[in-house]
Each structure stands twice: as structure tokens, then as C-alpha cells.
């Protein structure tokens, strides 16, 4: 606890900024409630949770809102896709920082603090944490997305044992939208996600547009987020296509 307090004092101007956590939901079932439950155990107090529901028919968003009435629930009248669904949340967000988070994730209690500390140290950009599997917390899911020689995106380190090889901050090819973190001004500068894509490759597109205007993608390894080996939207595959 003392170490955490010292770290927080290192944040610029000793101001604890508001963080908006945006979770896009579409029939995620109990995964959504479990995700929010893990967020509630975060060692950071100044945040808001915005759940954007893309016209689910499994009542997962209603059950989550019932258990956590303090969340801000936005119910879209139709499935507007991953990109525009998250854009709805970004437009409603009040935070200095924004986190885009998938509903099938669980978070480490220090994740927000470590993301902010990395951002304050390394500057503007699009950030991702270290992803470990929910099954054993020791197998890597991603330590940064990279662009293959032939143009394909891949998740570096996926399936490898976390032996400490990827424990340093790095500039990466692009940040995963499983959990993507930046200041609200950066998302707005990039005109948010491109709704033309609907879903998939949206993270590569956003970060590519960022790189073109000198907004790099960063890997923040001290921030930890857990993700299933086979995610809610993806099957186990090292490649992003």
C-alpha cells in the first residue's frame, strides 16, 4: 500500500485524473458482470464505467446494471458494430483518460495506476497492458501487436510462458483494443474509431492513423489484464485475421 501511494504521488501535479472505462457489450452473458466486478476491486478511485449495449437479447447488460447501479448504461437501438459502439461511449465519456475494455477480460487491481504512470512517463500515445490468460495468470496473450512482413497483424508472445522477457516498456506496432488506453484528446484527435470497419482490424487502423501523426503505440507491461485463451470474439490464433 505504501509503494502504491508513493507511485500515485509521482503522477503529474498530484492530480488524480478521471478515467472513463468503456465496455461494449453484445450478448456477453456473465462475462460482463465478472468484468465489472473485477474493475470494482481496482486500487484507483476516480473512474466511471460506461457500458454501451449493442442491442443484446440475453439481458446481460440489464443484469449487470442491476448489480452495479452506479454504472452508466447506454442502450443502442441496433447493433452499430464494434467501432461505432465504442464511439458512442467515447462521446459520452467525461474522463481525462479513456480505456476501451472488452467484456471478457478481468483486470489486475493496479492496472489503471500502472497505465497512467506509464503514460505520464512516456508521453502521448495509444497504450496496451500486458495480457495474461485467465486460466493460469502465467501464459501470455499479448505483449504488443506487431505488423508482419506481409502486412498481417500478430500478437507478440501469445501462448508463451511469462518468464519476464517482456517486462520493459516498448514502442509497438499497434495497441490491442482488448484494452486500449489513452487520453480523451488523443481519441478525439484521431476522430475515434472508423465505423466503416464495423468490427476487426479497428485497432490496427486507429494506431496506424496515430502513427501517421506521430502518436505511437506503447506497451505498458506493469499494467496487467487477463483474457481467456479463446476470447469471446476470437478463437485461439496468433494472427489477427
Give a label for each model feature.
Residues 213-241:
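Active-site-adjacent helix/loop segment of glycosyltransferases
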Residues 98:
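Short aromatic/hydrophobic "clamp" motif used to bind/position activated sugar donors
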Residues 105-152:
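Conserved donor NDP-sugar-binding/catalytic core segment of glycosyltransferases
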Residues 75-93, 103:
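Glycine-rich, basic loop-to-helix element that forms the pyrophosphate-binding segment
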Residues 173-224:
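A short, conserved alpha-helix in the catalytic core of glycosyltransferases
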Residues 33, 58-66:
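Acidic helix N-cap motif at the loop->helix transition within catalytic regions
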Residues 37-46:
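Short, acidic, metal-binding catalytic loop of nucleotide-sugar glycosyltransferases
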Residues 148-172, 188:
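Short, flexible, basic/aromatic active-site loop/helix in glycosyltransferases
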